[in-house]
Amino acid sequence: MALTLEQKQQVVAEVSEVAANAYSAVAAEYHGIGVAKLTKLREQAREKGVVLKVVKNTLAKRAFEGTKFESMSDRMTGPLLLAFSMEDLGSAARVIFDFSKDHKALETKLVSVGGVVYGPEELERVSKLPTRDEAISILMATMNAPVTKLVQTMNAVPGKFVRTVAAIKDAKEAA
């Protein structure tokens, strides 16, 4: 069933809004995956803060105009499933990568992060990017390390002094 002009405009507006707020996007060819498996993929995506859209490429190209995913437009061919990361950079890549391990029919075509389009070979690398919480904890650990080392160094001096005095005392008692 063909979409009316109003329906097409609504689809373009929805995808454009999602793309404007997304951190990254993954385009994957889904040909050969059944409805039940796609439904399972959608459930997994929702849990991870990923929005999945199946849209005609011409409508997706219009929706991407003026967004950081505009560079994907000229490389979109075939029936594509678009996954948008709404919470962190790697969430869409993580969902698609994990799902494609078990379902070889889901074939990644494009990965876009920060306006740069990568090929399917970069999907695993993007999927391993830390989540926002993980990145914050890594940053905090890095910032905390010099202070921790300083405290350990400052505690080492009195500790060495006490051990030296104890060794002298033990040596005098033994003599």
From Swiss-Prot:
* This protein's GO CC annotations: ribonucleoprotein complex; ribosome
Instruction: Tell whether Magnesium is among the UniProt keywords.
Output: no
Q: Any idea which UniProt keywords this protein has?
A: Ribonucleoprotein, Ribosomal protein, RNA-binding, rRNA-binding
Give me the segments passing through the membrane. Answer: none
Q: Which domain of life is it from?
A: Bacteria
Gene Ontology biological-process annotations:
translation
Q: Example GO molecular function term?
A: large ribosomal subunit rRNA binding
Checking Pfam families in the record gives: Ribosomal_L10 (PF00466)
Keyword rRNA-binding in annotation: yes
Tell me how this protein assembles: Part of the ribosomal stalk of the 50S ribosomal subunit. The N-terminus interacts with L11 and the large rRNA to form the base of the stalk. The C-terminus forms an elongated spine to which L12 dimers bind in a sequential fashion forming a multimeric L10(L12)X complex.
Query: Could you say which protein family the record assigns here?
Result: Belongs to the universal ribosomal protein uL10 family.
* Entry-linked HAMAP family: Ribosomal_uL10 (MF_00362)
Q: What does this protein do?
A: Forms part of the ribosomal stalk, playing a central role in the interaction of the ribosome with GTP-bound translation factors.
Name of the protein in its database record: Large ribosomal subunit protein uL10
Its taxonomic placement starts with:
Bacteria, Pseudomonadati, Pseudomonadota, Gammaproteobacteria, Moraxellales
